[in-house]
């Protein structure tokens, strides 16, 4: 329902679209803008612990800059404890290893039910800690969390091996066995959703998990940890550690008793994790990293739709999306009109209190990101891009940035090459389809891309030519738990979601048995 409402709202344009979205949000419960923080420790073996070091760190409300609370700071010693608990839970004969696959699915469904029960609280806590609009937390993020967990619950007893008719008097078959102890490191831009993306396939296939949550946004993941216990998962199956990348994250990536690591975050850190995994026990690695995704607007595109979708592609989630459409390529004969309309749309974007249902854009997640984005804006101006709107802070307090649009952007500019991760739109001009393919692919990234055209031949050609793990045609940011997501080149390795997402969490074992006589 939400996606249909959002698409209809986009087609109507900003003013009428907001009215439609406003009507849809009337069914959304009124949030508590100061939700109580119930859990701020480390979750190991279904119990809450202080850090071994007794250290804590503050988590901050990005709308105000005020400290929400202090959270236990896990590091190597805590990772060691969590891995030990996970390894014990994975031993042969343990309750988790002996559990029926269908029962694992039931537990995942139970977890989804508990999250749905506490949906209003979780959405409010996500908004408080992350800064994204509450209406997005409730209608988008939580909706996708529930669908992801329930999707993988259904796979628990359906992802299995095969019998193989090899020659001779033999019976041969394969088993899909869990990898073992899975280290999972999740980012701050979609804390609840990324937790679900990681937990769903890992638990459905019978693995155990040591998860490090982002230091900027630890609160919702810790609350879900308690729901995991309430759902009935055995002790040690899921362990959650708040902490910092160079300490807790590095300890997971280099741990000799961790069998796999899955990471979502920057390409820079992805390099470090790949190296640490290789230098330790050559653990399996799944990486979902950065992007600089091209969004190609052909001259025959539906102008109203393309403008609104390009705006959404860049500015959604305060621009803090790895797959954001951050290089908007527009064919030259519609360039001027597209730029004019895009600037008008950006100027109409509502920035403010994320708990206000009228707000489209909240603050950046923290001061570091705030300053980083402003630095990229400064770079764009210095390198000759034309600043058409925005360009500065949007409030005296908190980490709000004005919706910003640059025109006359050239491929060699810093803002056209590097991932900004903020509300900064770059619009580039192109002449021919062949030209734009070369320019779009001339990037170290390859996470996503989009094409807007009414010509099926152009859509097919471009979707095949673009070097990206996902290509959207006449839409953007359309996700489903059923469809895989991942990147080419420096945007990562492996896939999450869909049946493909299960492969990274299983080992395929061949068993061959000699029999007295084989019959067909």
Curated annotation (Swiss-Prot):
EC top class named in words: oxidoreductase
PROSITE patterns: ALDEHYDE_DEHYDR_CYS (PS00070), ALDEHYDE_DEHYDR_GLU (PS00687)
Active site: 288 (proton acceptor), 322 (nucleophile)
N6-acetyllysine PTM positions: 55, 76, 162, 371, 378, 386, 429, 431, 444, 454
Xref: InterPro entries: Ald_DH/histidinol_DH (IPR016161), Ald_DH_C (IPR016163), Ald_DH_CS_CYS (IPR016160), Ald_DH_CS_GLU (IPR029510), Ald_DH_N (IPR016162), Aldehyde_DH_dom (IPR015590)
SUPFAM superfamilies reported in the protein's UniProt record: ALDH-like
Site (Transition state stabilizer): 189
Modified how: In response to mitochondrial stress, the precursor protein is ubiquitinated by the SIFI complex in the cytoplasm before mitochondrial import, leading to its degradation. Within the SIFI complex, UBR4 initiates ubiquitin chain that are further elongated or branched by KCMF1.
Keywords: Acetylation, Mitochondrion, NAD, Oxidoreductase, Transit peptide, Ubl conjugation
Molecular-function annotations in GO: aldehyde dehydrogenase (NAD+) activity; carboxylesterase activity; NAD binding; phenylacetaldehyde dehydrogenase (NAD+) activity
Catalytic reaction list: an aldehyde + NAD(+) + H2O = a carboxylate + NADH + 2 H(+)
Enzyme Commission number: 1.2.1.3
Ranges spanned by the short sequence motif SIFI-degron, renumbered to the chain: 13-27
Chain sites annotated for binding NAD(+): 186-188, 212-215, 245, 265-270, 288, 419-421
Cellular localization per UniProt: Mitochondrion matrix
Gene Ontology CC terms, in alphabetical order: mitochondrial matrix; mitochondrion
Quaternary structure and partners: Homotetramer.
Family as reported in the entry's similarity comment: Belongs to the aldehyde dehydrogenase family.
The protein, known as: Aldehyde dehydrogenase, mitochondrial
Organism: Bos taurus
The organism's taxonomic lineage, starting at the top: Eukaryota, Metazoa, Chordata, Craniata, Vertebrata
């Amino acid at each position: 329902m939400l996606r249909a409402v959002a698409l209809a709202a986009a087609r109507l344009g900003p003013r009428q679209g907001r009215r439609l979205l406003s009507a849809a949000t009337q069914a959304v419960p009124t949030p508590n803008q100061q939700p109580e923080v119930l859990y701020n420790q480390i979750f190991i073996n279904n119990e809450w612990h202080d850090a071994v070091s007794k250290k804590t760190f503050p988590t901050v409300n990005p709308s105000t800059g005020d400290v929400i609370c202090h959270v236990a700071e896990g590091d190597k010693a805590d990772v060691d404890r969590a891995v030990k608990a996970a390894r014990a839970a994975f031993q042969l004969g343990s309750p988790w290893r002996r559990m029926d696959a269908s029962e694992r699915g039931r537990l995942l469904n139970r977890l989804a039910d508990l999250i749905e029960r506490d949906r209003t609280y979780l959405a409010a806590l996500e908004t408080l800690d992350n800064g994204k609009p509450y209406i997005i937390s409730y209608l988008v993020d939580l909706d996708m969390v529930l669908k992801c967990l329930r999707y993988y619950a259904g796979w628990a007893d359906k992802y299995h091996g095969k019998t193989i008719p090899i020659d001779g008097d033999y019976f041969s078959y394969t088993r899909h066995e869990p990898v073992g102890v899975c280290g999972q490191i999740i980012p701050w831009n979609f804390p609840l959703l990324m937790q679900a993306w990681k937990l769903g396939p890992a638990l459905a296939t019978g693995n155990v998990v040591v998860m490090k949550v982002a230091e900027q946004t630890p609160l919702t993941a810790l609350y879900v940890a308690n729901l995991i216990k309430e759902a009935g998962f055995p002790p040690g199956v899921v362990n959650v550690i708040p902490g910092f990348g160079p300490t807790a994250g590095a300890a997971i990536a280099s741990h000799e008793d961790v069998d796999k690591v899955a990471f979502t975050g920057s390409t820079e850190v992805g390099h470090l994790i790949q190296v640490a995994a290789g230098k330790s026990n050559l653990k399996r690695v799944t990486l979902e990293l950065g992007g600089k995704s091209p969004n190609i607007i052909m001259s025959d595109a539906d102008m109203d739709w393309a403008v609104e979708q390009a705006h959404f592609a860049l500015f959604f989630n305060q621009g803090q999306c790895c797959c954001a459409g951050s290089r908007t390529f527009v064919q030259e004969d519609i360039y001027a009109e597209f730029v004019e309309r895009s600037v008008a749309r950006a100027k109409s974007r509502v920035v403010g209190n994320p708990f206000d249902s009228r707000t489209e854009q909240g603050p950046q997640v923290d001061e570091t990101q705030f300053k980083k984005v402003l630095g990229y804006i400064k770079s764009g101006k210095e390198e000759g891009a034309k600043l058409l709107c925005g360009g500065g802070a949007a409030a005296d307090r908190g980490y709000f940035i004005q919706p910003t649009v640059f025109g006359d952007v050239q491929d060699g500019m810093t803002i056209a090459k590097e991932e900004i991760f903020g509300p900064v739109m770059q619009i580039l001009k192109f002449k021919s389809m062949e030209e734009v393919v070369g320019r779009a692919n001339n990037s170290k990234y390859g996470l996503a891309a989009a094409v807007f055209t009414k010509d099926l031949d152009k859509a097919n050609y471009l979707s095949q030519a673009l070097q990206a793990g996902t290509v959207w045609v006449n839409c953007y940011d359309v996700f489903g738990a059923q469809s895989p997501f991942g990147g080419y080149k420096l945007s990562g390795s492996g896939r999450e979601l869909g049946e493909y997402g299960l492969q990274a969490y299983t080992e395929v074992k061949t068993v061959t048995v000699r029999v007295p006589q084989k019959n067909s």
